[in-house]
């Protein structure tokens, strides 16, 4: 990850501010945290996927140490970054061209002009429990997500106003990958700037097929306007992210990939 960040940054692509370190030097990461009071994420610098060894929303030195120990089980080189506001988008690039984009859409509430977000969350959780679904906690991710929208649990959204209440999946749901369960096709929302960023990333890595992960609050504007970043690249991207089993809809990029393979 640090090498990819370096390659991208040298070519003008936005990546997270970060610091690499090893477990013995975890206090360096604690110093980094002081510059990012809204929280950081610690992760292995190499060799993992699906959120393995990743700890989000770190706020204290002791949490940095604990997260570093966990990450070190997967890789001796560690990485700390600030939490980035927004949802995660996977842009799939094939032969230098963006072919599909999906979003890991966080849960949302709709305001009624009277109720606080805390009250709306309580009602939503009652509905979720009645259906045997996991309720949403007003945890650090919820507070962080509300904060970057200028909201809190005591805010009263306008009638019809949609409020994002979670950016990262609940880690207790072990069957769910952190930030990597994509459930909405958003190819039509991707602005030219993000498209060019994804295609440039694929070119830098000299990869015919790559999934470029962005974190942004708005995919319709460039990253320098939204504060977003390229968070990760996957040179063996899973097509299951682009397939909606609930609707039995076929993944749009699959025929393109097969055609590209069979035409060579």
PLM region descriptions:
Residues 1-142, 191-196:
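Active-site nucleotide/adenylate-binding loops and adjacent lid/helix of ATP-dependent enzymes
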Residues 3, 66, 196-200, 252, ...:
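Long, highly charged amphipathic alpha-helices
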Residues 3-7, 41-44, 171-176, 188, ...:
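Short amphipathic alpha-helical segments, especially helix-boundary/capping motifs
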Residues 42, 78, 210-212, 231:
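Hydrophobic faces of well-ordered beta-strands that scaffold small-molecule active sites
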Residues 70, 74, 125-220:
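A long amphipathic alpha-helix within ATP-dependent nucleotide-binding catalytic cores
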Residues 86-88, 95-99, 207-209, 223, ...:
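Coil-to-beta-strand transition motifs
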Residues 180-189, 203-207, 216-264:
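C-terminal active-site "lid" helix and adjoining low-complexity regulatory extension at the edge
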């Amino acid at each position: 990850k640090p090498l990819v960040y370096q390659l991208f940054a040298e070519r003008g692509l936005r990546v997270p501010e970060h610091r690499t370190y090893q477990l013995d030097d975890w206090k360096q990461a604690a110093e980094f945290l002081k510059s990012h009071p809204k929280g950081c994420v610690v992760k292995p610098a190499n060799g993992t996927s699906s959120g393995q060894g990743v700890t989000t929303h770190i706020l204290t030195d002791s949490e940095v140490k604990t997260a570093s120990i966990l990450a070190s089980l997967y890789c001796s080189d560690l990485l700390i970054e600030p939490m980035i506001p927004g949802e995660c988008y996977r842009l799939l690039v094939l032969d230098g061209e963006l072919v599909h984009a999906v979003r890991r859409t966080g849960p949302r509430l709709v305001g009624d002009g009277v109720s606080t977000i805390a009250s709306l969350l309580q009602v939503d959780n009652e509905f979720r429990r009645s259906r045997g679904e996991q309720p949403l906690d007003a945890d650090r991710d919820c507070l962080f997500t509300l904060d970057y929208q200028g909201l809190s649990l005591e805010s009263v959204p306008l009638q019809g106003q949609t409020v994002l209440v979670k950016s990262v999946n609940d880690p207790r749901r072990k069957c769910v990958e952190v930030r990597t369960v994509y459930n909405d096709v958003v190819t039509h929302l991707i602005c030219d700037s993000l498209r060019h960023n994804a295609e440039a990333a694929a070119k830098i890595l000299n990869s015919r097929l790559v999934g470029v992960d962005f974190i942004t609050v708005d995919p319709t504007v460039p990253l320098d306007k939204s504060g977003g970043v390229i968070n990760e690249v996957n040179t063996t991207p899973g097509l299951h992210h682009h397939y909606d089993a609930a609707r039995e809809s076929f993944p749009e990029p699959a025929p393109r990939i097969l055609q590209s393979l069979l035409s060579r």
